[in-house]
């Protein structure tokens, strides 16, 4: 009599396990590296959160009343990556400006933690509709950059591509074509211009196409008014959704906060809706500890929600962001003497793109009876029909994925 799990099946299973062990990548082995402490790496994630909010405040002061959107993990990772190619003084300057010295971790451990945090994000891509990537393009004639190349590939989940920067126009085309291909045409013409003496280009992106679900299947989409401010109103698709959400009041921010967990992906999405006329105050008062306190106070409740469909996209040259953070010199021939800095004496380009869309899950709208039935119960009500702030982080390691201000949800 043959058992349900035969000896042939057992041998096949053993063979597959051996094959998996043999074909483990370096990245998988690094993920199991006992020297990587997830608890310590959460300190790095926390630091990224704090630094990104500081950066957001400075961007808000300079941007007027428009949208702001960037990916903290992608922006800070790109800047931290540059320290791999720097001598001790410059590397220290970059990491201290990013406040990583306050984690108490050695430089090597900080870079390992970036690998760990980025790896955790990449693992969610198949189930979360999240797409992210990083590529470094370096001039083909450069030498003495082995440490930089090795670190970029192994620690920052980045492709390393050697190209000829002599013809900057052709180099720009090659970079844009490569990124368009690896992003499956989701990212087009990410680099707008290159200086003629460019030797290095760092390009990264993050895309999240989120879908809003409902515990009860109560959802529909209607075109309604959205108030931009200053007496201006536009028509936008508004998702009407009844579901269990987190809705609470933050008094010292003069704001109502909605946290959604019913979006695709293991992410926490915070919408901070300032009271009328309080946006500027909220932006300058916001700190990351606010979010930590919010999470401790979360209580779920039935919410009658109207939220605009979002279609947001912004591209940032990181040189200006580094300046806002206080990183005043990178690869400057007058201040560095390492092999990398002796070689890299020209211009460099660092670009980060963030794309965020949120729409309704499924194409079949709910019937009015669904809303009427649930509408008879005690519930919170929230209309996101005016500008708000948005902050998105993963639940596993608290990595900040997106941070921004939404004035026009269809920009």
From Swiss-Prot:
SUPFAM superfamilies the UniProt entry points to: Serpins (SSF56574)
SMART domains: SERPIN
Record site: Reactive bond: 376-377
Location in the cell: Secreted
Alphabetic keyword roster: Glycoprotein, Protease inhibitor, Secreted, Serine protease inhibitor, Signal
GO cellular component: extracellular space
Glycosylation sites: 50, 89, 101, 164
Tissue: Expressed predominantly in epididymis where it is found in the epithelial cells of the caput, corpus and cauda epididymis.
Induction section of the entry: Expression decreases following castration. Administration of testosterone restores expression levels.
InterPro entries: Serpin_CS, Serpin_dom, Serpin_fam, Serpin_sf, Serpin_sf_1, Serpin_sf_2
PROSITE patterns: SERPIN (PS00284)
Molecular function, one GO term: serine-type endopeptidase inhibitor activity
Signal peptide residue numbers: 1-25
Pfam families tied to this protein: Serpin
Main location: secreted
Role description: Inhibitor of serine proteases.
Family as reported in the entry's similarity comment: Belongs to the serpin family.
Anything else known: Murine alpha-1-antitrypsin is represented by a cluster of up to 6 individual Serpina1-related genes. The precise complement of Serpina1-related genes present varies according to the strain of the animal.
Domain notes: The reactive center loop (RCL) extends out from the body of the protein and directs binding to the target protease. The protease cleaves the serpin at the reactive site within the RCL, establishing a covalent linkage between the carboxyl group of the serpin reactive site and the serine hydroxyl of the protease. The resulting inactive serpin-protease complex is highly stable. Variability within the reactive center loop (RCL) sequences of Serpina1-related genes may determine target protease specificity.
Name by which UniProt lists this protein: Alpha-1-antitrypsin 1-6
Organism the protein comes from: Mus musculus (Mouse)
Taxonomic path: Eukaryota, Metazoa, Chordata, Craniata, Vertebrata
């Amino acid at each position: 009599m043959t058992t349900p799990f035969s000896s042939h099946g057992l041998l096949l299973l053993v063979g597959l396990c051996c094959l998996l062990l043999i074909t483990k990548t370096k990245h998988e082995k690094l993920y199991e590296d006992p020297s990587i402490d997830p608890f310590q790496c959460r300190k790095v994630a926390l630091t990224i959160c704090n630094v990104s909010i500081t950066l957001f405040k400075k961007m808000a002061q300079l941007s007027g009343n428009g949208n702001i959107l960037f990916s903290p993990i992608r922006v800070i990772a790109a800047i931290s990556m540059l320290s791999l190619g720097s001598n001790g003084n410059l590397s220290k300057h970059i990491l201290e400006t990013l406040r990583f010295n306050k984690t108490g971790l050695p430089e090597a451990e900080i870079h390992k933690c970036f690998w760990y945090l980025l790896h955790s994000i990449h693992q969610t891509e198949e189930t979360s509709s999240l797409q992210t990537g990083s590529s470094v393009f370096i001039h083909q004639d450069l030498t003495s950059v082995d440490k930089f190349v090795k670190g970029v590939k192994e620690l920052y989940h980045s492709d390393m591509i050697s190209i000829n920067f002599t013809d900057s126009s052709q180099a720009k085309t090659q970079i844009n074509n490569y990124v368009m291909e690896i992003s499956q045409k989701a990212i087009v013409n990410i680099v707008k211009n290159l200086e003629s003496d460019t030797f290095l280009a760092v390009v990264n992106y993050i895309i999240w196409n989120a879908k809003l679900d409902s515990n009860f299947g109560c959802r529909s989409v209607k075109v309604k008014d959205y108030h931009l401010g200053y007496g201006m109103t536009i028509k936008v698709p508004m998702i009407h959704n009844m579901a269990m959400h987190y809705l609470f009041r933050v008094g010292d921010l003069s704001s109502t906060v909605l946290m959604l967990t019913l979006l695709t992906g293991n992410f926490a999405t915070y919408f901070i809706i300032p009271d009328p006329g309080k946006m500027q105050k909220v932006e300058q008062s916001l700190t990351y500890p606010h979010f930590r306190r919010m999470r401790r106070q979360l209580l779920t409740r039935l919410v009658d929600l109207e939220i605009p469909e979002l279609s947001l996209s912004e591209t940032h040259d990181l040189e200006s962001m580094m300046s806002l953070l206080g990183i005043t010199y990178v690869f400057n021939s007058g201040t560095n003497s390492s092999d990398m800095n002796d070689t890299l004496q020209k211009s460099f380009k660092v670009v980060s793109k963030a794309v965020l869309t949120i729409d309704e899950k499924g194409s079949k709208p709910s019937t009015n009876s669904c809303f009427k039935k649930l509408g008879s119960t005690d519930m919170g009500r929230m209309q996101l029909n005016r500008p708000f702030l948005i902050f998105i982080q993963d639940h596993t390691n608290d990595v900040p994925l997106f941070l921004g201000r939404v004035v026009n949800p269809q920009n």
